[in-house]
Curated annotation (Swiss-Prot):
It comes from Arabidopsis thaliana. Regulates asymmetric cell division (ACD), especially in stomatal-lineage cells. Acts as a stomatal lineage scaffold which regulates subcellular localization and transient polarization of kinases (e.g. ASK7/BIN2 and ASK3/SK12) involved in ACD in a BASL-dependent manner. Promotes the differentiation of both pavement cells and stomata. Disruption phenotype: No visible effect. Decreased accumulation of ASK7/BIN2 at the plasma membrane and impaired polarization of ASK7/BIN2 in asymmetric cell division (ACD) precursors thus leading to its nuclear localization in the meristemoids. Keywords: Coiled coil, Cytoplasm, Phosphoprotein. Changing T233A: Reduced ASK7-mediated phosphorylation, enhanced stabilization at the plasma membrane and increased cell division. This is Protein POLAR LOCALIZATION DURING ASYMMETRIC DIVISION AND REDISTRIBUTION. The gene is POLAR.
Amino acid sequence: MEGSRRRRGDGCTIVQCYTPRRFVGRWLSGLRSSKGKRDAGEEQEDDTRRYQLAPIRCSTSLNQLVMQDNKQNCRLNKSKEPETNTFESQSRESPLEVGIGSFLLYLVVASKTELDKMTNLRMQMEMFLLNAKEQLQKKDTPMSSNEASGFQFSPQEFSNLASSIFQESSSSVLQEEYTEFEVSEPEDYRRGTDCNSKLQAEVGRLPLGEKAEDRQTKHQIQRQCKLKDNEVTKSHIPEMVVSDERYGVCPYELDKKLHELLETRQQEELVKLETALNRVERRLQEKETEVSWWKDAARLLAQRVPESSRSGLEWCNPDSSTCSERSVPRSYEACSIHRTSFSR
């Protein structure tokens, strides 16, 4: 409830707003003034009706009547004074009561709005707490399941862990065995070195055309020796078998199976290498027999050729470091430095 009053100043209008208390006070004062005027008019009418003058009969009676009227007026004034005092006190107290009532109404409305806000905040907080509890329960359920099961792992995780542990253990054991093998140098290792040296010597004796094949065989033989060394090292590895009832295969059993597979493959490769070695040995024997045949043929020819024809030839001694080349008949050829051979 608001009222306004306009005032005109220097070419502009100024609007003055009243407070609710002032507006209610002015409204109540207007009502009181109109009510007071009505009451005063009614009292005057009553007085005129009560105190109408009687017809004048004589002078003495007039004086008496005037005295009586004055007395009655004094009495009436005395009786009206407390009534006016009570009315003024009531008129002063009524705007205060109205203002207090309006203020109380305003407080009630404001408190209601605040209570509504508080209820909304309470509902929001309850929803937030419920969501937080649900999230915490969801996070705690996998941890509780792991604790209840005694930290059980899934099969995939266990297989990954087993493979990693197996690799680490196998690498450490192999390193230890290799170090022991290098320090001890068993007889198998020495035999392998002897084989390599013999093969190198035989390959040096072969002619130039067959050196490519001999290189391949040499490479295969070296691989064979390495595989034998690996077999020796694997024979020293301790076989440890640990049975696990929860899961299917133990890592040590897997290690054993892998070693068996490797051994079978290595044996197959060894068989192939042995066959290749046998072929090379056969070829070497054939070449040696051919060389011996050529030597025998040369001796026979030397015995049968007359001395006059042998004068033009100078034989190359295999023990001598140098060999002189001279004119040789077309049907014969001199050999290289280290051995002699003739071809027709």
